[in-house]
Amino acid sequence: MSVSAVVVTYNRLPMLKEVIAALQASETPVDNIIVVDNKSNADTQEYLTSLGDQIRYVRLEENIGGAGGFNKGIRYFMEETVYDYVWLMDDDTVPTPTALAELVGSAAKVDNKFGFLSSDVRWTDNSRAKMNLPFPIDRFKKIPLDATEMEQLRNATFVSVMFSREVVDKIGLPVKEFFIWGDDIEYTERAARVYPGYMVPTSRVIHKMAQNVESNVSLDSIDRVPRYFYAFRNRMYFSRNRGFVRFLRAHIRIAYEAAMIFFNGQPKKMLRLKMVLKGVTTGWFFKPKVEFAKNKAKG
């Protein structure tokens, strides 16, 4: 069972070095590390170039966001390698030495019939990372911190998640037009329609975010507010394909988030509301196409 890791990076060199070192220290060897660079600065380029054949370096000509980066990384995995599995992570995701071993072992437990396998994502204080909380099929179930058994999930984030070549061949690539936010949820839900997706609680990674907080348009800093356009547009897009109940629930949730803008004491309320409305209205008509990659393993 062979595994390629895909790391998407943008101007976080110190953290990227830690991620690559952790991958190289994995108790179950990573057969191949693909680093997709969203046109980071010269320091990142020089460092990645200096690694030579320790990695496969894919430098992009422009920053196409996390969604575009993972699209390119998975395409490279499919078209330039013949490895069995692809393991995705951000450039601030530090896997523990046994993280991959637990994913690979769990794949064998289900006879490799899984849509995705995700790790238990923790923050630096060992609490669950709030941006990567697991969502079980049973929406009322909470997975305990000391869980050891695989748990079926609705979806997962790209902070340590593994797919098989077989599944990628069937479902295609992440939607690069998402740019950021929601590409991972849409993609893992697509994968879960092929086989069930699972969380592997014994596979641990550390998501080294500056703060352990969820994204929130009403509370976030002003410099980050414009990116919420993508969040709401993308949520509208995939809610249209989730059935009426989930479509309705998405609209109710978004209406609540918009209302909270006026109850939280943060500045630029109209700018925040503008991003919500612009994202929602654009999302009603947003129809990107799913791309497929050639499968080198098929010849």
Describe each region flagged by the PLM.
Residues 60-80:
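Glycine-rich, basic loop-to-helix element that forms the pyrophosphate-binding segment
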Residues 82-92:
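Short beta-strand-to-loop acidic/aromatic patch adjacent to the donor-nucleotide binding site
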Residues 98-131:
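Conserved donor NDP-sugar-binding/catalytic core segment of glycosyltransferases
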